[in-house]
Amino acid sequence: MIRNLLNAIPAGTSRGQFDGKTYLVSKSIHNAGRSIKLFAEEAGGDDFVSLNFYETSHGESLKPCEMPAEKVLTFLRGYEPDASA
């Protein structure tokens, strides 16, 4: 589930929309795709989302950075990358 949400966001740096606001997103992929780091920052605002994602033999593991998992999941479910991304 989380993997599918992350796959909808392009690797590298991109822009998109969440909750009517523009976000700058940086997504990096490591370990042959088994590890993903994502940082999103509201353009002109103070909101941000930060996470690490791991896919192991035991399944998916979401590790939010200094925030509740629900905030991260809400962002991933609602974020829409710009068409040019």
Region locations from a protein language model:
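C-terminal partner/receptor-binding element of secreted or periplasmic proteins
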Residues: 74-81
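The AdoMet/dcAdoMet-binding core of the Class I SAM-like
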Residues: 84-85
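Negatively charged, low-complexity tracts enriched in Asp/Glu with abundant Ser/Thr
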Residues: 1-26
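Short beta-strand micro-motifs enriched in acidic
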Residues: 28-30
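Acidic, aromatic-enriched beta-alpha/helix-loop junctions
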Residues: 33-73
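Intrinsically disordered, low-complexity regions
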Residues: 13, 17, 45-46, 60, ...
